[in-house]
């Protein structure tokens, strides 16, 4: 009887202290892909908030194209789209505020510039060169410096064209430049690093036995961001990037469907 009770107590202790099954301590970063505000999926962003509460990560990484910035695109524009870019920036800052409120003290928050955000510098270069240096950059527009001065987190911004600016352990996180059928394999062969990227809105994971690469889907509302009447093959997803004390990284891919996901064996939904 005593042996049986001892086994029950041990199992209960492990259940309530899952870190005892993990071995050496890990840091975990929540990785969020393309949002395309104002065409983001509201269920997706709320789900991210809920997952932050559930896993208490050490940081958050947004892979770029957080904003759609259609207003300054060179492509033809839907006349029914009437949002101002300033309004979209404010909406994205509200999302960041919601996520950061749930993150622990001194969490690292990395915001990457995507090709959609880089439209701002391209627009200035192409249409109003004389305003170069007068229009605020994205770090200013998103209040990165102010957030670092008065907030409880460490905020970082990574320019689009510095592909290896954001590195966590032995993993490079980038927005992405390629857009072909087997894009994860393309990036693996090109960079020869562990790589997580967005851009394509598709979920692909590939490994050569030494390194791995992952195209981490998206978090947008597909009916608003897709520009084709046929199926896209897109997939909403979230990444959990784990890094050990030696800087070795592993990635858990969490697929998202209609505001639902399974994280560490538990279904979370909004």
At which residue positions do the language-model features occur?
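Metallo-beta-lactamase
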Residues: 132-170
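Core catalytic region of metal-dependent phosphoesterases/phosphodiesterases
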Residues: 28, 32-147
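A generic local structural motif
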Residues: 17-18, 46-49, 96-98, 159-162, ...
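Acidic carboxylate-rich catalytic motifs and surrounding loops in phosphoryl-/glycosyl-chemistry enzymes
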Residues: 108-115, 158-162, 252-256
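Conserved beta-sheet core of the metallophosphoesterase superfamily
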Residues: 169-255
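Beta-strand-turn-beta hairpins that frame and shape the catalytic cleft
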Residues: 23-29, 165-172
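Polar, enzyme-active/binding microenvironments
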Residues: 253-268
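Acidic, histidine-bearing metal-coordination/catalytic regions of metal-dependent phosphoesterases
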Residues: 1-40
């Amino acid at each position: 009887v005593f042996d049986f009770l001892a086994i029950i107590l041990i199992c209960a202790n492990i259940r309530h202290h899952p870190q005892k099954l993990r071995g050496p301590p890990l840091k975990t970063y929540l990785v969020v892909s393309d949002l395309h505000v104002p065409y983001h999926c509201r269920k997706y962003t709320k789900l991210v908030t809920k997952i932050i509460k559930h896993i208490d990560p050490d940081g958050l990484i947004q892979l770029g194209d957080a904003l759609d910035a259609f207003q300054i695109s060179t492509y033809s524009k839907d006349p029914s789209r009437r949002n101002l870019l300033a309004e979209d920036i404010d909406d994205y800052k509200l999302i960041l505020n919601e996520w950061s409120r749930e993150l622990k003290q001194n969490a690292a928050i990395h915001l990457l510039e995507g090709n959609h955000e880089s439209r701002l510098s391209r627009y200035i270069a192409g249409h109003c060169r004389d305003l170069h240096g007068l229009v605020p950059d994205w770090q200013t527009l998103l209040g990165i410096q102010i957030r670092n001065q008065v907030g409880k987190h460490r905020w970082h911004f990574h320019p689009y064209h510095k592909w290896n600016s954001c590195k966590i352990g032995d993993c490079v996180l980038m927005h992405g430049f390629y857009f072909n059928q087997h894009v994860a394999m393309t990036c693996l062969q090109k960079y020869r690093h562990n790589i997580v990227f967005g851009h394509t809105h598709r979920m692909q994971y590939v490994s050569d036995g030494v390194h791995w690469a992952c195209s981490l889907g998206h978090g947008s509302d597909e009916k608003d961001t897709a520009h084709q009447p046929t199926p896209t093959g897109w997939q909403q997803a979230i990444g959990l990037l784990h890094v050990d004390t030696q800087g070795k990284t592993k990635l858990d891919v969490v697929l998202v469907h209609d505001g639902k996901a399974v994280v560490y064996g538990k279904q979370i939904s909004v």
